[in-house]
Amino acid sequence: MAKALWSGRFDSAPDPAAFDFGVSFPFDRRLFEDDVTGSLAWAEALARAGVLDAADATAIADGLHAILERGRKEPAWISGGDEDVHSFVERQLVARVGDAGRRLHTGRSRNEQVSLDLRLYLRRRIPLLQQKLRATIAAFADQAERAGDALMPSYTHLRRAMPVLVSHFLLSHAAALRRDHARLDAAREEANALPLGSGAIAGTGYAIDTSFLAAKLGFARVVANSMDASSDRDFAASFLHAVALSMVHLSRVAEDFILMTGEEFGFFELADSSATGSSMMPQKKNPDPLELVRGKAGRAIGHLTGLLVTMKGLPTGYNKDLQEDKEPLFDAEDTLAVSLDATAAVIGKLMLHPGRTARAASGLLLATDVADYLVSRGMPFRQAHEVVGAMVRRLLQEKRDFESLSLEQWRQSSDLFGDDVKERVTAAASVRARKTPQSTHPDAVAAALAEIRDWLARG
């Protein structure tokens, strides 16, 4: 057990059972780079404030740079019996530069230090998740382009609804993932505030130039209130919310393709490299990667819920409960990263069966188009809905669909059906009849795909 940074107050060594319970170094070692980065800036701020002389400031900076370089080259070196990553860095610094290293923590609390480290960490790591999101979105865009003018049914209540282009369905998932990308931008911006200068809770008694520190570390602003800063984990909760919603959307992707690659749908087929088999049943081709993505969504949601419950009962100011922010945050990041990789790999190799989807896109799901046809001939929509509903009921009883009707049979339901009804009531005509820019009209889908390509190209 390394000597604790706070040991001067106590006349006996910590009970290992109690001390070890509070040790966070095994997981907060991930903040090593951010902790050193923050300490380098803090040392410079202390020197500018006249708290450190030039010799000590130089020694501290040189020592921290050496520590950072070794940690990057030898990640396994970042270990030991320290209480946390802050203690590890300070111990290594003192070992290198002596008493100068003991001056580094002047005017600074670990309360603000850990907040700084987490903010720096999220600013550094969120763009990596966004890269993976873009790769997954690109996989959907590629599949949408390959799908061309293939048709499929859309679903509400998991019942066939209206014909759509397969590409429109694929781009619906890309649209949701783009919102996740934007939410991560917002989470990064929320974290982009400098907490240094807040001290343990009341601020620091040294003339620290926080504007300089913010600029040095690339922060957009300085926090407004030192008491709030010491206990603020809103930015961590916002990140977990963004991750949880991303995982919800990936879970929906997984659910769709678990269903649609099964024999009952057969719309798509998983590549052999995207599936596993059964140890007992030789015929099985199981969507294990998708099922794991779906399962891991609950894990991410749990991390968000757990942090919110941790935060909700705390009095104002720092409390040790907040140590429980890091493990869920790190695991949520890891979970989203591997889930995005797996999803992009599976989607990128999907095989479409356009004949199967086209057959499923015909039949009674053209009922809305039949009603719209009557509306175009002057019938009020509510009356058209009633007429077409009666037609559907009769066709179901006769085990037929609209395509089997002769013109005479059409006109038995309404004299408004004209010679063009059979060409107007097809799946292809249905998608061409959509008018709005967000619709499944081929031109709208082509424009949406082009816009996504442009967005991806901009990075």
PLM regions: where:
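Glycine-rich cofactor/substrate-binding loops
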Residues: 2-38, 92, 99-100, 266, ...
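A helix-coil-helix interface module used to build multimeric assemblies
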Residues: 1-203, 208-212, 276-277, 292, ...
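Helix N-cap/coil-helix junction residues
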Residues: 51-52, 219, 379, 400
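A short linear-motif detector with a strong N-terminal bias
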Residues: 25, 82-84, 94-95, 238, ...
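Charged, flexible cofactor/metal-binding loops and thiol motifs
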Residues: 118-126, 130, 145, 153, ...
